[in-house]
């Protein structure tokens, strides 16, 4: 059970971060404390920082992954506390989650917390019509 004092403390941390207009790295540290103290996550067992995600040939890094029994169950992307969350941030995080086959994505700036369920399907191709190469593009 989460103590009310921990939630109050987390609210104060976010307000102070907003007042100081903290950068993304400072916001990340604050979010990590919230995940540990309010959500009760073990930073050694449940959280991985700066997890490498290989996209279209480039390696990028998601701020945190939430791991249960060694399996990534959620990707967490943190933006600077004063930066409103935008669709481009969700698109970035969605790429990461799909790349890792993860269904949950949490996007936050400390003030806003948006949990998204990501649905995706394996890309499969199937032949729907088979013709000889010479007939492939000829009108019937």
What are these model-predicted stretches?
Residues 109:
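Phosphate/diphosphate-binding loops
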């Amino acid at each position: 059970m989460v103590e009310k004092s921990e939630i109050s403390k987390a609210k104060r941390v976010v307000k102070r971060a907003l007042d100081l207009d903290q950068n993304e790295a400072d916001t990340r540290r604050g979010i990590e404390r919230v995940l540990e103290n309010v959500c009760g996550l073990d930073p050694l067992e449940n959280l991985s920082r700066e997890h490498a995600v290989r996209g279209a040939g480039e390696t990028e890094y998601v701020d945190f992954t939430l791991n249960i029994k060694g399996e990534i169950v959620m990707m967490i992307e943190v933006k600077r506390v004063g930066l409103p969350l935008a669709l481009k941030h969700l698109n970035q995080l969605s790429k990461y989650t799909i790349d890792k086959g993860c269904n949950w994505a949490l996007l936050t700036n400390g003030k806003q917390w948006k949990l998204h369920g990501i649905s995706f399907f394996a890309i499969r191709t199937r032949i729907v019509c088979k013709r000889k190469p010479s007939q492939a593009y000829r009108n019937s």
